[in-house]
């Protein structure tokens, strides 16, 4: 891209190479006739030339690498892009903390049980990281109720805390009378989000610019949904052609991490439908991206030449499971390729996908012996319907 900006300067007649700048300086010096000692052997002339040429070269390079690219939305970044976004009423979305509920189960329902604010619920170690939720308010589980939801918030901001059901199930400090704790399906009421990236803000800018007339088309709905939700605009998918009758359309929302819960969907629908942010005659409803479930079998082979103890084997198996789950958006702690709607993972593409994943597993977890494990994973309904999908390494 920098070559394009360099070409722009060259076409305008501005020298961009050091030799060109030197030649231009020498030409101007000769025209003025103020300096006669211009021998290449002269220390004075070499000093004057360096003083004139080097700063111009620095400024030219900075102009090509920083100034010109940041004058255009497509190539601008950070504060420069922020200034561009201000022109259409946008700004970087700040990082937010995940909020939701975790269910506490009592040992007995014959008495009340109080869960104090500040109680911590955490995950097992996922790729050497432990995620924690904190109870936000004191909650009483009354007599006669065995299990009840307790409001929680993530320890830190970010999308990594939007884990799937079952990850948060450990109390680092035991509570008398509590037999179990777990985040269930639909536990998220407000997903956490990372600070918006340059590319994500650029996409929202493009959407905002295309919807400047405020006609209620896809770009407008994408803009308003992305504003209220912890989503980038490319995670919002529309179904047109009146799926629920004339004037109707559906929007399907996809989180980068975790499952899009119904309380979160309800929040977005209230904003779009009940608070007046829809067009005349429009009928748009947001849904979570539909899912199907498939059994995947993963075979882990440990190298016979390397001794691996039973405890370490179990750790490796757990890490491999978490890595595979990351590909299906249940966590965000591994650099694996994610599944996306309208992406077919069958036949050759499926094999290629698992070849890549297998290579990453091999690089991350070497070992000994053989181990097989079957896991249940999420897959999107856009994929071809299959009762089972098996990949082996």
UniProtKB/Swiss-Prot annotation:
InterPro entries: Baseplate_J-like (IPR006949), Phage_Baseplate_Assmbl_Protein (IPR052399)
Pfam families, A to Z: Baseplate_J (PF04865)
Record's GO cellular component terms: virus tail, baseplate
Subcellular localization, as worded in the UniProt entry: Virion
Keywords: Viral baseplate protein, Viral tail protein, Virion
The family this protein is said to belong to: Belongs to the P2likevirus gpJ protein family.
Function: Putative baseplate protein.
Name the record gives this protein: Putative baseplate protein gp29
Source organism of this protein record: Haemophilus phage HP1 (strain HP1c1)
Highest classification ranks of the organism: Viruses, Duplodnaviria, Heunggongvirae, Uroviricota, Caudoviricetes
């Amino acid at each position: 891209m920098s070559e394009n900006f360099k070409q722009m300067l060259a076409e305008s007649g501005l020298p961009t190479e050091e030799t060109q700048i030197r030649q231009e300086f020498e030409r101007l010096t000769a025209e003025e006739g103020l300096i006669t000692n211009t021998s290449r052997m002269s220390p004075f002339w070499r000093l004057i030339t360096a003083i004139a040429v080097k700063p111009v070269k620095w400024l030219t390079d900075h102009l090509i690498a920083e100034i010109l690219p940041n004058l255009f939305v497509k190539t601008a970044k950070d504060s420069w892009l922020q200034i561009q976004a201000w022109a259409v009423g946008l700004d970087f979305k700040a990082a937010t903390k995940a909020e939701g509920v975790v269910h506490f189960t009592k040992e007995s329902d014959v008495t009340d049980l109080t869960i104090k604010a500040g109680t911590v619920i955490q995950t097992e170690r996922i790729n050497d990281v432990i995620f924690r939720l904190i109870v936000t308010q004191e909650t009483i589980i009354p007599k006669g109720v065995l299990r009840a939801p307790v409001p929680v918030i993530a320890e830190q901001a970010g999308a990594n805390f939007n884990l799937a059901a079952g990850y948060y199930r450990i109390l680092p400090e035991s509570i008398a009378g509590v037999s179990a704790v777990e985040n269930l399906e639909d536990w998220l009421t407000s997903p956490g989000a990372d600070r918006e990236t340059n590319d994500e803000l650029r996409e929202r800018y493009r959407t905002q610019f295309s919807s400047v007339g405020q006609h209620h088309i896809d770009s407008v709905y994408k803009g308003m949904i992305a504003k209220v939700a912890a989503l980038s605009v490319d995670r919002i998918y529309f179904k047109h052609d009146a799926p629920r009758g004339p004037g109707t359309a559906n929007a399907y929302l996809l989180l980068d991490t975790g499952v899009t819960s119904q309380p979160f969907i309800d929040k977005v629908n209230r904003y779009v439908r009940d608070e007046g942010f829809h067009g005349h005659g429009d009928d748009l409803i947001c849904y979570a991206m539909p899912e199907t479930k498939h059994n995947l079998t993963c075979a882990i082979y440990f190298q016979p030449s390397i001794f691996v103890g039973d405890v370490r084997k179990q750790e490796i198996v757990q890490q491999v499971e978490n890595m595979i789950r990351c590909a299906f958006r249940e966590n965000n702690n591994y650099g694996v390729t994610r599944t996306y709607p309208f992406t077919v993972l069958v036949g050759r593409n499926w094999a290629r996908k698992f070849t890549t994943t297998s290579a990453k597993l091999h690089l991350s977890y070497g070992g000994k012996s053989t181990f097989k494990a079957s896991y249940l994973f999420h897959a999107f309904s856009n994929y071809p319907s299959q009762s089972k999908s098996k990949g082996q390494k």
